[in-house]
């Protein structure tokens, strides 16, 4: 496959959303928040209320997610940067754009960053008085039940089926709990496996071939995660399918997620991961159907083929099977229900819809404004000292970014270092423009939390934002007159407890928690900031010998994580980045 790419200015997501709306009447774009919503679903549209469906996630999977906004499917989505979750603010903006008195169902793929951000947005919506349910999609079978017990199955092809079927259920007037039940039944009765000839090329990143010229990989994710195993030489499509179907259908105790019996109603989806020709994909679909019929006596009731949820230009395909009989009810009726979503096979637009675009402008809507807490905490801080400490931490991040990015290229999707740098650049700009309220300790930390959430995205952005928000609340609740080491120590412990409500990661799971908890515990034990920073560094170093249990690295083969044995093993990139940040803070503070 070609790894060449056209040059871009780095901002391709927002123009894509505008281009999609330009060719699909009835869609409105909130540019700043990268939200696309169905104009007819807005609260002021005058249309009868129905349960609204909100989804989203990282970009790079097109037509998912924005391509499934339409009548009979999703009502709104929030788009993150490539392979990075949208922020909580973006998601909340999408929820507000289609707020309904009948409630909102949030559909999210089962990835750590997505779960954190969409979960936090759901909680904020509930706190604001909205009725909200959340369904997490996990249909991957490449990771067995034992290894995936903590993180669950990755969300892959079934995400599209949930969008379509739950959207139709909502259009039929079902209540929120009923629509959520339909969505969950699709998740519970779907399985997916994918295979590829290589990893995809991420715009703006240096292309690199991960697999050898004669290698292929089974179990590939949609974020460039390594698969379950690699093999060579290259097989025929028929040989490859014969290796993939047993992972979906064999009754192995560790991998048998859904039972399929002859004569049951089964939906087959053959998904192009972005780089296969339509000719090859159609051929693969026929081979899959033949083997299902001949080897397993399964005759698909519905078959759909195309690019539904991609990994940019990934040269591979995925097989998704849904047991519609076990899912029950009107699943096939909802599957067949027409939709205007461009990512589906069936589209319909009225002349009235097209009139909106006849004026030459894409409908846009104003961004939802961030509501900052204006109530001071009374905990004073020295502005210049606070800014100096922040800038020192940012400088440390810039220093270690190349190494962190390299580590994450092996263990994840390669964005950890650049994500941290993005957060640092936003804070540097804010300090330069004096927009951070650093003279008030709690307000300053709250401002930092908002900036981190907006600028970083991804899993780390969500974790940092949650921790900082709770840290600010801990400072506010301290009742102290000024920010001291003792104030920070107590608030840090409160913040860690709050963070644990939103992540399953704990020490030993090979995440940034392996650096954060030792730092907090050292402070709590009275060892002082310098000893705490050293504890964070030591914790990050210990991850070199750990197996990942949560996050994207948990899906990567162990041999990939052992590529740096000469250094003592591959450390967790997030832990390394956090340890460097804390070292910069502590050094600038004079410890």
From Swiss-Prot:
This protein's UniProt keywords: ATP-binding, Glycerol metabolism, Kinase, Nucleotide-binding, Transferase
Transmembrane segments: none
Domain DhaK intervals: 8-344
Location of region: Disordered: 40-59
Pathway(s) it belongs to: Polyol metabolism; glycerol fermentation; glycerone phosphate from glycerol (oxidative route): step 2/2
Catalytic center residues: 223
GO molecular function, one term: ATP binding
Positions annotated to bind ATP: 413-416, 459-460, 511-512, 572-574
The keyword Cell wall biogenesis/degradation is assigned to this record: no
UniProt-listed PROSITE patterns: DHAK (PS51481), DHAL (PS51480)
All residue ranges annotated as the DhaL domain in the record: 384-587
Class of enzymatic activity (EC top level): transferase
InterPro entries from the UniProt entry: DhaK_ATP (IPR012734), DhaK_dom (IPR004006), DhaL_dom (IPR004007), DhaL_dom_sf (IPR036117), Dihydroxyacetone_Kinase (IPR050861)
A Gene Ontology term for the protein's cellular component: cytosol
The EC number(s) this enzyme carries: 2.7.1.28, 2.7.1.29
GO biological process: anaerobic glycerol catabolic process; glycerol catabolic process; glycerol to glycerone phosphate metabolic process
SMART domains associated with the record: Dak2 (SM01120)
Protein's UniProt keywords contain Iron: no
Family in the record: Belongs to the dihydroxyacetone kinase (DAK) family.
PANTHER family registered for this protein in UniProt: TRIOKINASE/FMN CYCLASE (PTHR28629), TRIOKINASE_FMN CYCLASE (PTHR28629:SF4)
UniProt protein name: Dihydroxyacetone kinase 2
Name of encoding gene: DAK2
